[in-house]
């Protein structure tokens, strides 16, 4: 094959490869669809409603270690990004080594207002994506961190066992 014929072929090949990568990343950044609700719960401290939580899975049931899972939190009050990150780090204490928490977490947890929704989607491959009001924020590929993050709400020894039971559809 002459050099003149190879260049157009390589250009077309590169264009197709880039298009495939672009479509894959676009598909992964779309808000998850087709999941069934497992359970829901309201999280309150004293008399303050903080958020409503809903958990979704492929078939509407929760089985530890299985994915995909989608956790949606709809907030009832304003909370700064810094407060969300700090509380997340506090809740991860004992579940995940603080030094190993991905630095991107600071960029992925936005400030929220009353009515805002923050969602975390754990894919079957262990990657986790964050969404804010349905808009893709970014993802973390650390499957150990992603599981520990969901365990804040789903672990048998979570700080709020009633919330955990309801999210798992047990009440």
For the regions a language model picked out, list residue spans one by one.
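Bacterial N-terminal signal peptides that target proteins for export
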Residues: 2-13
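N-terminal signal peptide c-region/cleavage motif recognized by signal peptidases
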Residues: 22-24
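Terminal leader/tail segments of proteins
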Residues: 26-171
